[in-house]
C-alpha cells in the first residue's frame, strides 16, 4: 500500500461556488429503495441506538441500523416499525440461531427493509454463507455486509449477494482491535475506504474513525455512500448510556461492541468504555451535521452530495494516531 493517509491528513480543495446560500444544497442520499436526509447513520451499538432513537430517525427520514444485542426483541421491533409505515433495519450475526431467525422471518412473512450482517471480521465464509441464506429466504431485504478492509473482501461479499459493504476494521474511538491484535484500518481508515471503493460496484458504508463533521465530506469524496458514526452520536440526551456527573459536568458512557461492558464478561475483549461529555439533543447534532454538509457541498462547487466526489485534495501529514491518545 502506497500513499496511506487518514482523515486528519487530508484537506479538500474548494471549487467555485454556484449557490447563493448553503440552504440550496441538497444532502440527501439514496440507499436501496429509500431516500434519506443525510449520508450518515448512527453506529449499531448499544450505547448509541435503541428503539426510541430508531423510531425518531425513521420518522424524520434518517437512516438507522438497530443493534443486535437484544436478539429476542427483533421480531416485535420489525412488526412495530412496519405497522407505523416506517422502515425496519436490523442487525444479525452469523451463529446458528441467526439462520433460524432468518427462516422464522420468512415463515412469518416479515421482510425487514435492511439487514446488516454485523461481524468484526467480515471477510469470512461465515458472512458469505449468511448473505446467501438471507438472499434465499428474504430476497427483498437490502443486505449490508461487514466489516471489511480490503478490495478482495468487498468483491467477494458483493459477489455473494451483498447489496452494500461496510468498511472499517477497528478505527473506532472505543475500539482497541488495532492495539489488541495488530490488525485493522485504524490510522489509515480513509485510505482503506478509497482502496475498497475503487473495487466496489455497490454502495460502501464507511464505518469508524469519524471525529468531525468534515470527515463525513471526506468520506463521500473517497467513495462512501453512507457514513457510520459512533462517538459523535454518543452522549446525547436521548442516548441509551448512563448519565453521570463529574466535577459539575455531565457525561454519558459509551462503550465498544466487543467490550467487556457489552459482553458481560472479560473474554475476547476488543473494545473499551469511555465517558463522553453530554452533548444536548440529538436533533441539534443532526441539524448541525446537515448544515455543515451543505457548506461542504457549496465549497465543492455544486448543489448535491455527488459534487464532493470530484474535488481535488491535498495530503497534509499530521498524525497517524487518528486524534486519539492511545495510552
From Swiss-Prot:
It is an enzyme of class 1 (oxidoreductase). Its EC number is 1.7.1.7. NADP(+) binds at residues 204-227. Keywords: NADP, Oxidoreductase. CDD domains: IMPDH (cd00381). GO terms for cellular component: cytosol; GMP reductase complex. The keyword RNA-binding does not apply. GO terms for biological process: 'de novo' pyrimidine nucleobase biosynthetic process; purine nucleotide metabolic process. It catalyses: IMP + NH4(+) + NADP(+) = GMP + NADPH + 2 H(+). The keyword NADP applies. InterPro entries: Aldolase_TIM, Dihydroorotate_DH_CS, GMP_reductase, GuaC_type_2, IMP_DH/GMP_Rdtase_CS, IMP_DH_GMPRt. The active site is at residue 175. GO terms for molecular function: GMP reductase activity; oxidoreductase activity, acting on the CH-CH group of donors. Belongs to the IMPDH/GMPR family. GuaC type 2 subfamily. Catalyzes the irreversible NADPH-dependent deamination of GMP to IMP. It functions in the conversion of nucleobase, nucleoside and nucleotide derivatives of G to A nucleotides, and in maintaining the intracellular balance of A and G nucleotides. This is GMP reductase.
